């Protein structure tokens, strides 16, 4: 699209295919590094590329470390950059939490982000309230899917921007 001219790769790395992911990590052994990705709507696709590249490198995915932001609820609240409706988005995230809990227990599947909520105009109290509510929603959905809270909750992280005025 004409509007994308000059914007691709301007904010982060442009990953459009598994070949892009292979190029990104060429010469980097994914088993030896922690990879954090600030990606939300397309997180499942980008994460699948990452896992496939790690497997192609011969990595045991159960030992991989890293974090996905993967906070779709924040997208609905603050950034307005979602792909799927809320219910379907939560199902995808819960499926990813299940996959990582079962196969990649060292990987953080969600970094619940208040930062963007604050940047969208909330007060510090609102940022904290929305972010914790989002975190509770992820936990509730995972438990409804049959995950044991003790197996997945330690892998959740939070990212705040509440400044000194909380």
Segments (PLM) and residue ranges:
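Catalytic alpha/beta active-site cores
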Residues: 1-166
């Amino acid at each position: 699209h004409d509007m994308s001219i000059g914007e691709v790769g301007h904010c982060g790395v442009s990953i459009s295919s598994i070949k892009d992911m292979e190029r990104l990590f060429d010469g980097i052994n994914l088993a030896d590094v922690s990879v954090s990705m600030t990606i939300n709507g397309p997180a499942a696709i980008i994460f699948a590329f990452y896992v496939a590249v790690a497997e192609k490198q011969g990595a045991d995915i159960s030992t991989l470390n890293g974090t996905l932001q993967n906070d779709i609820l924040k997208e609905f609240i603050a950034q307005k950059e979602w792909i799927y409706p809320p219910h379907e988005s939560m199902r995808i995230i819960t499926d990813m939490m299940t996959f990582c809990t079962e196969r990649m227990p060292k990987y953080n599947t969600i970094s619940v982000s208040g930062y963007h909520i604050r940047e969208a105009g909330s007060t510090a109290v609102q940022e904290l309230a929305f972010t914790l509510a989002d975190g509770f929603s992820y936990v509730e959905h995972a438990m409804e899917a049959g995950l044991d809270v003790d197996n997945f909750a330690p892998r959740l992280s939070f990212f705040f921007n509440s400044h000194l005025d909380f």
